[in-house]
């Protein structure tokens, strides 16, 4: 066991360089949660699978990432913050290389599971390292910088992924992590190695970890495969649902009675932590789910190229980047609950604007809600992160950061699956309702079909095919 008093804050160039290195590692992690969004149709086509199956590349990464995050506390106490952070970066680089060379979907999914698992400690440890490196009176600034990287990654991912997929090859959306990761690992080690945290040997909560993996994996597979297997008409889906429910119940009981739990659920007795974690998790699930769906809709129904759909989502970052540093300055003088409430109102307005989208939507009408969404994004992460960590003793911050990041990441995976399934279900419903009108006895349909045949010089079969394509859109 090693012990030492907490080191003082960094200053000058070491603080600046260390902040950049830690932020780059965090950026690399969150970037990979969204960079594949616009590449899913291309990846699916190259690997010979459906777009729905291709979406597993995103959800399986998030699920593996969520499961590994709670291990951060135990691993940190066993090996130390700096060693664990640098090792996670290097393993993330290796997993990224495996993703890039994957010849088929099962291999890619296995590499993404590894990538998500080793990325688990990056978010909570980057937060802890930044808070320890900055003076306590400037902790709001440190949180703002951390939140900015957490924001910019998902925002930059679609545009960067679209450009790489269109001009190069989808493999490079993973290869770009290699130089960034090596740089971040080297600089972090140089700057922070003499600030290693105390280590001690603790028993690992093996039962809690296995229960966590069991219910999370069962729930995620159920959500991803439900549509293909006709949901609860399938005994497989029923079994997965029962396993997820029972596993979750046993997980709760075990973690609340275990002396060294893998997830410290007692943190939820802190009102600020509980409310902030629930709010940030639910909101991130909605945000990330739409971030995954929009590029696929633009490519599948509007005819956008990968690079075009990426650029259409890029304006999300304009206000988010500009306003996040401002949030860090005004947060100490403002009640963060008011800012978070305004952010939720802003999200509601943006989602209402998107309900007016149709197949002939103009580019400006498509981009405007995305541009405006950057405002509530900036007012969302920083205040809620401050609420989550407020009032906690320093020794509880790593566990609290890990648990809140678990909730956020897990809800991102679940939100993606739920929104994708809802989209597919509504598409089928509206297709059925529209095709119900496609009968020779319907004079309006017959007239419109004749008009299409005359205008486009189509045969009867081609006119019906044209109608079916229009309905699908």
Regions found by a protein language model. Give the residues of each.
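Hydrophobic transmembrane architecture of multi-pass small-molecule transporters
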Residues: 2-3, 8, 183, 407-473
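Transmembrane core module of solute transporters
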Residues: 13-73, 77, 96, 106-108, ...
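Transmembrane alpha-helical cores of Major Facilitator Superfamily
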Residues: 27, 59-63, 90, 144-148, ...
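Residue-level hotspots within transmembrane alpha-helices of multi-pass secondary transporters
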Residues: 38, 70-71, 125, 155, ...
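Helix-loop-helix hairpins in multi-pass membrane proteins, especially solute transporters
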Residues: 69-208, 235
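Membrane-embedded alpha-helical segments of multi-pass transporters/permeases
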Residues: 97-101, 185-190, 249-253, 352-355, ...
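Small-residue-rich alpha-helical segments with characteristic i,i+4
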Residues: 145-147, 153-158, 162, 290, ...
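Helix-loop junctions on the cytosolic side of multi-pass membrane transporters
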Residues: 186-206, 253-262, 359, 425, ...
